[in-house]
Amino acid sequence: MSSLAQQLQSIASLDAARLTSAYGAPSGKSYLFPPDVASSHDIDSIFDLAQSGFDELLSLDPEMEEFEEELFSESAKRTDRMVLSKEENDNLDRTLGRCLRRLGKWIRLMAGGKCIEWMVRRFRVHEMNVDEVLRSFLPYHESPNFPRILAIVTIPKTSPYYATFAPLVKDAQPIPRSYIVTSISPAKDKSLVLLGDIASMVQQAVKEGVVHHALLTFWTATMVDLLEGARHGKGANEGVVKQLVESFVTLLETPKAGEDVNAAVYPPLVLLTRTVPLADEPFLAIVSSLLTPGTGSNPSQRMLTLLVILNDRHTWSLGLGEHATENLAKVSQLGEILVAAMDKYRFEKALNIVVKSMLEKPDLHAKALATVLEHESLPTSVTELASTNLLQLGSSTDSQEVKAACKSLLTNLRERHPSIVDTAFLQASASLEIDTHPVDHGLVQKPSGEVAFLDVYAADISSRVTGVKSVIDMAKKGEEIESSITALEARLSDVDENVVNALYEEPKSLLEILPVEKYIAGVKPVFWAVSPISHIIGLHLDFISQHLLVSHPEAGKQIYESLLFPIFLSTEKRQPLTKSQALKLLNGGFKKLDKLSTIGPEIGKAREEGMKGAQKGNLVIAKALAGATLSSSTFEDDISFLIAQLDSTTSSARLLAYLILHSLVLTLRGPRQLSTSLSILKYLSPRLTGHSLRDLKHADENVNTEYMESVYKKPEETRTTLRAIVSILAAMGKVIKPIGQIVWLSGESKAKDASYKTFAQQIYLWANIAILPANVAHFLLRSLLTQLGEEALLFFSSIWTSSTSPVPLRISALKHALAFIHAYATLPTSPAAQGQPVDFQVVLPQILIALQDSDKDVRRVAVDVLRSVEGGEGMGDVYALDTIYGDRSEMTQLLKSVDRKKYIETLLEVAEEFVIDRLRLKAFHTEVLNMQSGKNRKESAHRRAIIGFLMSHVASYRAIDPRLVLLSLLSDVHDTSILRSAIPLLASLFDDKSEESLWLSSLPDGQQALYVQALMGSLRVQSVSVLGEAGGEGWEFLLNLLDASKSSRFIARLRILSFKAMVGGVFSALEAHQQIEYIIALIQCIHALPTDDALDAVKVLEKLDIQPRVLIELIEHLSDPLETSVNRKRQRQDAADEDRPTQAVHELITFVDSRNWPSIPASAPLVASLMSILSALLAKRLIVKEGIDYLEQEVFGAILALVERITDAQEIQRAHVGIEVVIKVIRASTNPRTAQRALLVASELARLIPDAVLHNVMPIFTFMGASDFQRDDAYTFGVVEKTVSRIVPVMTQSLKEKAQNSLELYTKSLTFLSIFTDMAGRLPRHRTLPFFVHLVKSLGASDYLAPVCMLLVDRATTKAGRNKESVSTALELPANLVAAFDVSVKTQVLGEIVQELARLIGDLSKADKEAFLSQTISENDATDRPLRQVTYLLSFLSSILGQLRGKACSQALVQSAVRQLIVLAASTSQPVMATTDIPSNLHKTLASTMLLLSADNFLGVTAELLSDGSEQDIIMSLGVFAERLPLIKSEVRLRCTKVIAEILKRIGGLLAASGATVNAALEAVKSVIKTAIAQEDGALASVLPTVVGCIGKVKDSAVIVAALSLVELLVRRLAARTIPFIQSILDTSLNLIKSTKLAATATNQAFVTLSSVIETIPTFISSKQLNAILITTIDYRRVEETNSASLFTTLAKKIRTKSLFPVLIEAWKTVQEKGGDNEMKGFFEMLRLTLKNAAREDLPSMLKPVFAFFLDVFDLRHRLQLKGVDTRVVNDVEESAIGSFLELVTKLNEPTFKPLFIRLYDWAVIDLAEGKNADDGRLTERKIVLLHVMMGLLTKFKNLLSPYMGILFPHIQELLPAFASGSVRSEPLWTLLLNVLGKSFEVDSGAFWTDALEIELLPQLVAQVPLFLPIAPSPQSPRPISSCLANLAGSTTAENVLRRLNTAVCLATRSDDPKVRLAALDALSAIWDAQAEEMVGLVPETVSEFLAELLEDESKDVEIAARGVLAKIEKVTGSLKEYLE
């Protein structure tokens, strides 16, 4: 393999979808398109799509340019990630990451989607950059974009996003934010990796400058939700808090992060501080970060956030961090921010912290601190803090700047809060050291400058005067200029004369200080005041006149408009200008003002005394100002100012403006009059809505006395203003119409036309709406119509055809038009006056427009107008013929009188229908004007005359709405004349400078589109003949639309409409030569147009229906440049000629690609024509620069689509279609896609010309093996599959004919099959299986599936074959291949594989190889390759069996396979396989195969092998039989009883032979027993004797155990059927138990076998047999107790007591003879179990001998002691005997037991008492037995046996004194007696003992204390007497008994013998332990009388013991020191 191939293969896992085109095919998954659509786009189309998106993004985001070269260029198109090195891929990953993050902003735009599509399809970012992709899309998680990308991503398990999003990929959908928040929470992601990833998204975006709104919104919301969850849950995890704090601080400190980023941090930051109690260090870090400068944050937002978190932290005292003061100084408008926050939220705590930091450097914060401290609602705490800190700092600092700042702040503060500042001053004075830093009292005193500014605003006049003077003095010195200007500006509006005089005291200084604008702004309120003071105005006028205008004459216009204008008009209540003040306007600087210089005298005259004089003066001034305005050089500005004053709130200014404008309207002439009037109308129109002026009397165009009186007396009333409006509107009637013709019916007009048309329409509107007084309205209308004259009808037409005219106005215009038409005859200038008829047809189109009006009333009046213009048949003078459309009127076509009359009459016939339905007019024209069959030529001429008439008006009428209405009338009329008329209009749009084009360009886009669409609507199928007219413009127009060299703003829209018409049927109606010409022009146009336009053209080309004959001609035309003439002489050609072949290729590509070849009728000549393209391309391959590969591919695709539908082979042959060209293209082309399509064509031609194809079959397969097998795309493998399906069957048929059997067929096909199987490792993984499935189906699965699978398995045996795959991976392919076929084929393969396994295993020991796979082994192969072949075939076989499990398979094949596998399994003992896994694998395979075989067949195979198999085969078959038999269901077993019986019979024979098969035979029988059914018991019984018999023949313990186990199972299974064999079983088992040589396991199993016999058939075991069993078991107990105990239990439970007890009695004799303690214990254990399991009904008859037996047994102690047996042994034996006795007692009731107990008492106490002393040894022994029995009874039965103490009590009273006196000295008896008494006290519960009995017994018991002192007490074994007395004390609560007991024992402590004292103290200690609480009352006497003495005892041991007793008492009572003193 080449090194390049190795490299490609090594990275196949990174890019499994291999790239196939010249630059590689795109990834199969798509972001934008569904899979079926995505597969149709190759890399070039995706690149073009990406380029368009990238270009659009570049215009939006120029920074995208950095990715152009690397990701969006031609070189990027060739970038193949598969062949890049790791370093190159890493660099590319970084670039892609940056690009994806920048694209995050544009994801919702289509342009962004296009770029992402490119990155998915080209760079596979959805697989290789998944994390970056998901990060970019996460902000859009709830939009459709997110599931679109999520559905295609492949998330690696190592990604932090895997756990969250991998489960969602399959069913991708928008996800809620709550899901993401849960995923990043510590409960879901303990590593917090995902949280860190998301938290860092904004930081990364800021770093790269790619922040966008969606990202910030997502980030903030996610962080907030995460913290909200923690807030309402268990709190925030420490790791989460750490990550969030770090993220927030980092973002807040990021330079130039911007306002949006910082705003995004604030909500989660505040929530964090409120949710989590942060430590001081992270909190300080957050606070410090909020003060970081240069971050681009909004200062208000940041400071508010800081204040919020500081205010929430109530105990914060660590300040704002280092450099906080300096950073605060950099906050813009800090003071205003703090004041606003203080007003709204108070924030007192936080404000203290911030102000404290600012006060550290007050010079830096002087302005901000002043703003805060001067606030009226400043908290007291802040005031106190500021006072203290400023005093301390100001007194201690050496810096003059700091001291000045402190002083300024303190003085201002003291003015507002004197008491607080003074208190702080006193406190500071007391705290500071007087000597070093005395408090500076000057800090709290204001400087003189500040006093001055305060005085300026003082209420006192004198203070204001002083302040003004001081401020002016300061300003003169250059101090506080800005503040001075502000203060002086404020005082300019002062109304006190003294203050004003003070201001103007130094006029020059004032001018120098105040800018003119500031002066005018300051003084303006005085002039515009409601009640101005004239003498104050006079002072200001003096200054303006004498100083201001002298220094600043340029301010004259501003002074006139801002100050003087409102004071000109005098009213009754407002007279700002007296005569003396008015005269001031005549002098000084006012003389230089334009307006005042001409009206000075009038102003003076106007100010006469008296009201009438004032009214007249107002009019005089207004006219004078109007005249001044008229002559002004700034006329337009003045008019604008006057119109603006019409809205003034100051009535004087407003009314004066009305008066001036009124005068101007009347005096102006020409354009100025018109423009001024229009401006006034424009202003008034919207403001009069809702007002009515009709009730204003005496209103006209003149300014009358009533009007002026209202102005003077009632200026504020609305009615006065309305009168002024009516007066000025009435004056509009004096406006004179411009000289010359006005084109009323035109959308375009000259300036003068437009102005007057607008004016006339406005006046007409005012005159016709019910607002104006009637006389004014009539006057305006009469004036207007008088000036219009004959043009009135055209004017009316312009009104009703205008869409902007209201309905009432349209109706009025129509009515006026009707009146005009009737009155026209009376006009002197009218032709009717001379007796000539008047033809009004020129307005007929306008009437038609009115007939389509939306309002019914309009249509009704329009009908009346239509009737009025009907006229007669004569052709009179045509009204307005030359003027209606201005210069375009000559284009108007007139109707003949006949046509006119007929047309109007026809209209009038249905006129009422027009009124009812506005659409009826269109339907009428459609009916009348459409061509109708049967109509004569005259009718056609009439119809065309009307169409021509209407279309001429369309061409002349340059107004969009009328044109559209008229065109709509003809939209459904089909006539060629419409198109002829429309073409000139359309053609004129080619020239952008033409009038038509310029006019259309001025319209809105919507209207342009409607108009062009309406014109192009005339291009219909019915008008196609116009396109073919000689000399016509139609065809040229269409071709020009396809001429890319022509540019026009409308050509693209026209082209699209023409395309629509062509597709709509026009193209199909063209002649063939026209179709060819159009298609060629269209193709050339596609290559010359921009991309988007070209795409539209391509879509049109695709939709055009082209017939095959035209297609053939087109192909000839388009491919002509590719044809090479042999005889053509070589000559120099220019560059255009050289590029012509390339251009032809592109044109052919466009054409071929546009056709839907599957829908084109199949034609062999057409195929031949396409083949000719391929032939021509072969000759031009070296010349053509680009596109040849794609063209070949498309041509092949076209050929394929046609050939697939051709069924007649003769047709192909007649057309001379061959395969040679196809083969040549395959050899010549380097593009795999071309060759693939060629293969498809070749495959399809194989059906029609098979001989030619088969002749070239080897080149086909050579190509496939060399290229296509290694490519990964669906198309390539579709080609391969089709090729295989067509050609492979032919070859396999030949092979089948030559082979005799399957092995021979496999061998002959080996070379052929190896071609494919050798390529398996180089095929793309996901394509491999589908290919081989298709291959096998083509070969024939029944014949070839097995050998193909064998060869695929054989690949795994060599490294080269595996091709770097693992063995398991290599074996997956054959397994998956088999899985694709049905069960029958799989079963057949199973048999073949088993046979091949047999052959391979056989070949291991043969020289001549037989197996199929042995043929693949060469001399150079490793020696273990055959073993690997076997191993891997077994593995493959297992996978087949897994697929067949549970399926119905052919039993014959499976049975054969099973038999073969069993034989193979038996033969795996060869040395060569000993060290391999082959044997175990073979067994597993056999087990799996058995699952496929029916039980009947399996048993049959077993029976056959048992009869004719070798020893190894028999062992193996028995093993399989044992393993599989339990799996057979009972109903199946019932059916197979005979077979199983036969098998058991043969197994019996094997057991009798005792050979190597014994163990396997035993396991087989065991398997039968465990699952046997009743019908098999007979056969099993026949095997039992042979099994028992074989036990004695074998020596191996394991086999013996197995046989015994089998006997046990047989006995339990067969029950009574085993009776004949009981003796042999018992003998065998007992002999094994007695044997000393056997292993323990064999002995154990022998006991189990015995138990099974006893449990199963107990009644059939004889006494002799039982005795043997008992004796043997008792003897064996010496060796091991467990088995014996188990057998004892079994005997006691299963054998009846009546039968067993005599045997026990008999056995007792044998046991006594042996005399061993172990045997005795075993016997008594057996006796105990017998009595325990005895039936109560059996006991009465046995009781006497049983009790006698026990009495004899109880005397055993004596007999044993005589033999010298150890006492411990005697006690153990006795305990065993007593235990047996107790079991007997358990079975008895009291009446039966009591006599027995009395008899036992007599036996122990009385029988031997006569004649013997009390200490006789035998008597003592019997008493000990009695007490042992009693102890056992008390222990077992508790208080139930307490009454029986009464029987013993007399003898106890005898024994205790006897022990005390020393007459009885048996310590065991004494000990047992006291223990019995203690146990009796313990369990009594009042059953026997009473206080009297206890008191009676007490002295005797206390007398036992000094006895047997050598017995040392211990916690584990206390002295018997101490325990007895403690139990006595614990059994009673009687004070009398306890006191006596305590006293008696205490008295014993006074014994002279220290040992006795110790014994007494031990007893006393035990007593107090048992009953301390009840004996508390005895403490004084016990402690003070006895223990006090004992604590001083001479014996140290006694003292220690006494202290121990005292300590126990003190645990209950506390300290007892008082009793010891």
Swiss-Prot record:
HEAT repeat windows: 837-875, 976-1014, 1281-1319, 1935-1973, 1977-2015
Entry annotated with the keyword Oxidoreductase: no
GO terms for biological process, alphabetical: maturation of SSU-rRNA from tricistronic rRNA transcript (SSU-rRNA, 5.8S rRNA, LSU-rRNA); positive regulation of transcription by RNA polymerase I
Record's keyword terms, sorted: Nucleus, Repeat, Ribonucleoprotein, Ribosome biogenesis, rRNA processing
One Gene Ontology cellular component annotation held by this UniProt entry: 90S preribosome
Cell compartments where the protein resides: Nucleus, Nucleolus
Primary localization class, coarse: nucleus
GO molecular function: snoRNA binding
Keyword Ribonucleoprotein: yes
SMART domains (alphabetical): BP28CT
InterPro entries reported for this sequence: ARM-like, ARM-type_fold, BP28_C_dom, HEAT_Utp10/HEAT1, U3snoRNP10_N, UTP10
Description of how the protein assembles with itself and partners: Component of the ribosomal small subunit (SSU) processome.
Family: Belongs to the HEATR1/UTP10 family.
Function comment: Involved in nucleolar processing of pre-18S ribosomal RNA. Involved in ribosome biosynthesis.
Designated name of the protein: U3 small nucleolar RNA-associated protein 10
Provenance organism: Cryptococcus neoformans var. neoformans serotype D (strain B-3501A)
